[in-house]
UniProtKB/Swiss-Prot annotation:
One of its GO terms (molecular function) is four-way junction DNA binding. Belongs to the RuvB family. DNA binds at R307, R312. CDD domains: AAA. SMART domains: AAA (SM00382). The gene is ruvB. This is Holliday junction branch migration complex subunit RuvB. Mg(2+) binds at T65. Gene3D superfamilies: 1.10.8.60, P-loop containing nucleotide triphosphate hydrolases, Winged helix-like DNA-binding domain superfamily/Winged helix DNA-binding domain. PANTHER family: HOLLIDAY JUNCTION BRANCH MIGRATION COMPLEX SUBUNIT RUVB, PTHR42848. Keywords: ATP-binding, Cytoplasm, DNA damage, DNA recombination, DNA repair, DNA-binding, Hydrolase, Nucleotide-binding. InterPro entries: AAA+_ATPase, AAA_lid_4, DNA_helicase_Holl-junc_RuvB, P-loop_NTPase, RuvB-like_N, RuvB_C, WH-like_DNA-bd_sf, WH_DNA-bd_sf. It comes from Wolbachia sp. subsp. Drosophila simulans (strain wRi).
Amino acid sequence: MKSISCGKEYTEDVRNINIRPEQLDDFVGQKDLIQNLKVFINAAQTRTEALDHVLLYGPPGLGKTTLAQIVSKELRVSFRATSGPLLSKAGDLAAVLTTLNAKDVLFIDEIHRLNRSIEEVLYTAMEDFCLDILVGEGPSTRTLRIDLPPFTLIGATTRLGLLSAPLRDRFGIPLHLEFYSFEELVNIIKRGARVLSAEIEEDAAREIACRARGTPRIALRLLRRIRDFVEVKDDKKITYEVADSVLLKLGVDKMGLNKLDMNYLRFLFNTSGPVGIDTISIALSEDVGNIEETVEPYLIKISFVKRTPRGRVLTDQAKEYLSL
């Protein structure tokens, strides 16, 4: 099985690859999703067909890219990766699709960022396994049809609502990734420490998990930074005291909140009534998309913020936390 990235600018974060699971049985968390995915893969293999198209959606850092790679390995087929912003014209998409072999997996990250003209080309590729490309200009324009082998498209998005209904409906296997439980994160951190040859105490692993916002990517990033401090100080293991000290230096509090989170909460705290997302974006000098994708999901999960038709509202729980 080959793993190939398409496009000059698509550089998938390879820093976590060595501590990522490589098969579904090793994947921690998302239990129901994994069990269902095993059934779909086994059924496709039994019928010797390409797996139906898969849409992975949910907050950032929950394992969408990892799952896509695992699916290709379980299917024993080649894996090709690109991202929505790189496919700016039909020729870009055609260049990727025409290199696929039967049953290969094509992974499109940030698929919600595809422009509508590319989506329309993708419709026939997904449904009929062919490409209709316009050739020529003006009166001499004609449609060139290119047949494609059956393949599996795996799309990943943090913004499901930005996908057009026609594109969304063409995915036969929509899978929602949820935030991870505390114990699942502890297990992920322990496994990561073993792979990194870093000795870690149970209390330290649990403290990192407490501040990881239910997100494996964050948990592993924090683990790596703590390991840096331990190695520089020539300590033998990651203890609770070391983990707590480093996390505070990194600006991560006991709830896993960082400076941007706190600025967001304080702005709502000091503003009367519901506040619109555009107002928050201007006040914090942050992109609306970044706030909606990386800040709000966790704050909503821990019941610190509510979204209402009139805007964002701080909960009593958040007000109490800010008053501590």
